[in-house]
């Protein structure tokens, strides 16, 4: 199905001579050697591969199948939280992506969000997002990994309110369509036993970075849209993707469906690299809401 939003991205790709592909955040400079940031990312992925080779559970106590491939075209700092993993971007002050393995049991719990407050993440460098950046912005503090997926544990719930897991999000989208999608993902986790989820911001509607909208004194980037990809590994594996514009105008879920391949082209992120190649190729090329 052709969608206006996807065509817009494709058009930008075609007319931008300076871009080879649609990227969420271009690199600041060509990388020379291995930076401390790169070494940290490589160490994280090496640790997970070593754990898998020893048939051990990874140190994060979550399955690592949901993790995208390392990013080379933008800043990336991997943050391992109890209930999810963050790829943080020090330039945009928001995550590149947030990934988690949502099980049926994790959709239940006693932890309540009204007991929590939004907090700067001390693991990321300054300047970083703080509450003051949002006060007069008219944007909600939008969760990437939702509080509703972290009711199972006090630490997981608390960490979901770190600003490294938050993006400036239109109020209408946050309270309506995005919330509906979060609820739908929990329903799928209960139905299938578990799902692997990755979501994050989409940038790229501005060829000139000076046109990028920001909020607050720390210049937190405002996304043009948000993506979410969901993988079910049970039985005959399947995957589905979504992109919602960061706006208040109503967006029907069925009209926001994308294949994972399409979202990879738009975001420049390689999803589910640990899947068997044959399975990955198949599930990423097809997306039908009716299959879910």
Positions of predicted regions on the chain:
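Domain-level detector for secreted/extracellular nuclease and nuclease-toxin modules, and
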Residues: 5-6, 17-292
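Bacterial N-terminal signal peptides
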Residues: 8-14
